[in-house]
A protein has these predicted regions:
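Active-site beta-loop-alpha junctions enriched in small/polar residues
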Residues: 14-16, 50-54, 84-87, 135-139, ...
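Well-ordered, non-membrane alpha-helical segments in soluble/globular domains
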Residues: 24-33, 61-68, 151-167, 198-208, ...
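A short acidic (Asp/Glu
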Residues: 57-61, 92, 142-144, 192-196, ...
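Anion (oxyanion) recognition and catalysis
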Residues: 73-76, 256, 334, 361
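Acidic/histidine-rich catalytic cores of soluble enzymes
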Residues: 171-319, 327, 336
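Flexible, acidic glycine-rich loops studded with aromatic residues
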Residues: 261, 304-406
Length: 407
């Protein structure tokens, strides 16, 4: 839905299963009208669409796309952002690090992303900008042998991303919408934090991209740099940045310093807890985390020590090291409901969301806001509610924080 500050708020449909377009469309028809009725009954409701590769191929067929556009019009809904991170199965299967497959070293990722942008261009309301979030190049733990291997991966993935940028520039120059690819750092991705995003942008994307666009379009270096900044932005997933103990002020200040933009704010919360020195008290905390140990998604844990951070690739590895006396705090990658602040002896990083939304309210830094709690299906039973009620409650909570009515 469009808010009074002209930004748009939605939720990501990766919450709904369905890897084929027909299955996912059935989910949208089941839940979107109820959510809209609850949070935006009299105004158009925006959708944050997630399509698997299979679904994107099916929706690209003229008949399917026409049917979807007609449904959107009938329901007074519109699509303004997409989630292009998970390519394949995302529900009822073991996802773990396969969420990065295929990564940006492959042409499959390029073709999938370009296809999504063509669909988004066909769906966007006239005059509205669009964005698609994507994986942070690759999974870092696949490329740990040497620095030269990592550098080669960074170069290959960047050149592939520039193929997408070329298409976005062409679409816009030919009268189509302005759209941006929103890179989403996350723990153990090739980009995990603001500094790694900046290092990539300044040392790979711009140096490779400026001559690439100069050659493709006959434009100046300054025009090429501007095009890159417009078409490649940051997807600021609040959960992911909270996991690496970064404040919103730090993230936004560094981006502003280098003239970079936030294409999408993904509103999500992680689990956290102090790790007490007392063995019995610590064991209660560890037992609480153990309740969230499930086999579908990666639940990276980043522990805070007095002298830095300690990374565990998944919750089981952290549980094995639970007695480490140097560890003062755990934060675990588990998108929990944003309206819940505590889970027994565990807390959420909801305060990080409150801080970033306060900054958005004071001085808007993005037009796209998307709630992304995709783990409803694997949450402990006591946290599960009917899907439409859960989504509506999350969106309502965000609106309260923003103190902005629908426009």
């Amino acid at each position: 839905m469009q808010l009074a500050d002209h930004s748009h708020l939605t939720y990501c449909t990766n919450i709904h299963p369905g890897e084929s377009w027909s299955a996912h469309f059935e989910q949208l028809k089941q839940y979107i009208p109820a959510v809209k009725q609850e949070v935006s009954p009299d105004k158009p409701f925006g959708i944050g669409l997630r399509l698997s590769n299979t679904a994107s191929l099916e929706l690209s067929k003229e008949e399917a796309l026409s049917e979807f556009k007609a449904w959107l019009e009938t329901q007074e809904c519109y699509v303004f952002t997409m989630n292009g991170f998970p390519y394949g199965g995302f529900h009822h299967t073991v996802v773990k690090d396969h969420v990065h497959t295929p990564d940006w070293t492959t042409s499959d990722r390029v073709l999938y992303t370009i296809r999504l942008f063509r669909l988004l261009a066909a769906l966007l309301p006239e005059g509205m900008e669009g964005g698609i979030s994507t994986a942070p190049l690759s999974y870092k733990l696949w490329h740990v042998r040497c620095e030269s291997e990592q550098a080669a991966v960074m170069e290959t993935t960047t050149l592939h991303i520039l193929q997408v940028v070329e298409q976005l520039v062409r679409i816009h120059r030919n009268g189509g919408p302005s759209m941006h690819l929103d890179i989403e750092p996350e723990p153990d991705g090739m980009m995990e934090n603001t500094q790694e995003f900046l290092d990539w942008y300044l040392h790979y994307l711009l140096p490779l991209g400026i001559p690439f666009l100069e050659d493709k379009f006959g434009i100046s270096a300054e025009e090429a740099a501007t095009a890159i900044r417009n078409h490649v932005q940051l997807c600021y997933d609040v959960c992911h940045f909270a996991l690496v103990y970064e404040s919103a002020e730090n993230v936004l200040q560094q981006l502003k310093q280098h003239g970079l933009k936030v294409g999408k704010l993904q509103i999500s919360a992680a689990l956290k807890a102090a790790m007490p020195e007392d063995a019995a008290t610590r064991e209660a905390v560890v037992d609480a985390f153990r309740e969230f140990n499930e086999p579908t998604y990666l639940h990276q844990v980043i522990a805070r020590k007095d002298d830095g951070l300690l990374h565990y690739p998944d919750l089981p590895q952290a549980l094995e090291d639970a007695g480490n006396p140097a560890v003062k705090e755990w934060r675990s990658h588990f998108h929990v409901p944003v309206f819940v602040g505590t889970f027994g002896v565990l807390s959420s990083t909801r305060s990080d969301i409150e801080q970033v939304l306060q900054l958005q309210r004071k001085q808007p830094f993005t037009q796209h806001l998307e709630v992304e709690t995709y783990t409803w299906g694997v949450l402990p039973a006591e946290l599960k509610l009917p899907m439409d009620r859960s989504v509506s409650r999350e969106l309502g909570w965000v609106l309260q924080q923003l103190e902005l009515p629908a426009r």
